[in-house]
Amino acid sequence: MLRGASTTPLQDKRAFLPKRKLTELTGLIGNTPLLGVAFWGPLTQSRREQILACAEPEAFEKEVQGLVAELKTSHTGFRHAGMRNIPARHAISATTQCIAVNGGERWMFQDVHQGGPAYSAGIRPGDLLLDSGGREIRPPEDLTFAVGERVDLKIERLHGGQERARLQLPVPKSQKHPVTAPDPVHAEILSDQIGLLKVAMFPGVVGIDVAKDIDRGIASLNGCSRLIVDLRGNTGGGIGGLRLMSYLTPGKLEVGYSLTRKRRERGYRKEELTRFGRIPSRKATLFWLAARYAFVEKSILVVTEGLGNRRFHGHVVLLVNEHTASAGEMVAAFAEENNLATIVGTKTPGRLLSGNAFKVGHGYILGLPVAGYLTWQGRMLENNGIVPAVAEGLSRDALREGRDTQLEKAANVARHL
């Protein structure tokens, strides 16, 4: 404990984490592909007194979160295992966009995934958020939740009128990754032989279940000569995106690779990295898979599965937006680099690293990046993102008319491929 520090539970918690645990975690930061201990040590020291001065747990968490945010990378975070302050995209399966309304700013619901709490409560794209639990929320304040709670949101509907939407938030299976999974895959046939495959996320580390969902979605679009893959609002997940990428090309193609700091400094040839090129069909094989990769260096090369020719090959459009992140960006970058699809929408955020969550004591969890990700052509998407070949935003006025301008643009592009 720090000399002279109080022995109250909160003071003990504050002293324990900043001095002992956060200092120990400089070793974990050493695996970060972008920054190292030389950066983290002085920064921790400079913020220490601010952290120790916090009188309440919420302020303490906010200060440590601010410290971790100085890394300026994705897959960072600091929170309590009680799962407070979970962002809307993870808690209610919905994203928001800041728009101008009557001389001010409001959050507009943008991607509202089927099967998620927001969708089940009747919230739809274009609705405006007015308050949460009676407290007004405006940009730049983010909409966050505590999992398991019942929440009342005041909504201004797209077509006018105000209502209260009552959401019941489930308790996620994982405390380390508190994400409420919506229906991950939706498929439908649009006009002109265009199939639509919407993938909201890639749940699961290996992604056996979502891979099967993608299989069923593609099978239901049999006969379509053109395909739109809608990745808007896809916040990522595990390696299940490999199945989607494998449907975009007939053979086996290198996608990209994770790269730890240790491997980068030691030197490497990307062709010699350990390969991952098949999502198993049965969960019984997960034990074998875990044993195979448990003791290898965590720099892994991803290769498509070789699923054969599809009628829509060469006629694919990928829809992305500013919420398409992580594994969603991996899919988009692969399609772009190999000329497998035309990218339509808005620029992605550039949040693509391999991360892990570490328990640091007193119920707190620290999220840190542990490996970088590079495409096969050597691009790092972190903090860069993907710029669509065809730019198209989402219009609330068009939504009011029953039109999704981004989907309309994607369909028009698909017809001319």
Language model segments and positions:
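Conserved PDZ fold ligand-binding element
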Residues: 25, 118-140, 228-230, 335, ...
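PDZ/PDZ-like domain segments forming the peptide/carboxylate-binding groove
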Residues: 85-139, 196, 210
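Low-complexity, Gly/Ser/Thr/Pro-rich intrinsically disordered linker/tail segments
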Residues: 388-417
